[in-house]
């Protein structure tokens, strides 16, 4: 098969059903155990939800925007994509939580290429390259290939 790709938008889709299924989405054939799901929730700073794996709910209405974004991160940790695209996927989080999330992604998905779209300068430290788009006549963008401090 081809590369495994996962896209996490600012407002992730969360299906109605059990919390377990919401975390495993979109991989219906996921063999992740409940322990794996709980570990992913804990890494995404949602450990308080661990006891609710069997609960059926419309999680998009139960969880706050930040919790939905963290659930999507737990999903990425379960899915283990080759390519992970984050489009403002941590915009609803405060900067310390965002840093903790990126640290977990880097630690738990060492072979995943992460492409982030965001506006916060704090995201720079988690990436090796930066493409900056500006509204200037004749210019689309410029590639900044400075090694971010502390990144691999």
Question: What positions do the PLM features span?
Answer:
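ABC ATPase nucleotide-binding domain
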Residues: 1-5, 16-17
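Intrinsically disordered, acidic/Ser/Pro-rich low-complexity regions proximal to membranes
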Residues: 3, 11-12, 48
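ABC ATPase nucleotide-binding domain helical subdomain, centered on the C-loop/LSGGQ "ABC signature"
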Residues: 20-58, 102-103, 111
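ABC-family ATPase nucleotide-binding domain "signature/switch" substructure
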Residues: 6, 11, 19-22, 55-152
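Nucleotide phosphate-binding site architecture
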Residues: 15, 47, 91
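Bergerat-fold ATP-binding/catalytic subdomain of histidine kinases
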Residues: 14-15, 29
